[in-house]
Design a protein with these regions (language model features):
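N-terminal helix-turn-helix DNA-binding module of bacterial transcription factors
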Residues: 1-44
Length: 44
């Protein structure tokens, strides 16, 4: 599982996934929640 896979599964761009992983505050709560859901599902 890579960042690209997380992005594809969540429907967000690789950059957005990277910002969530790095705790950047410039990500909407909805996007963060969806991406974290995918990350947790795949134990990334």
């Amino acid at each position: 599982m890579t960042i690209k896979d997380i992005a594809r599964e969540s429907g967000y761009a690789v950059g957005t996934v990277s910002r969530v992983i790095n705790n950047n505050p410039n990500v909407s709560d909805a996007a963060r929640a969806r991406i974290m859901e995918v990350i947790e599902r795949y134990n990334f």
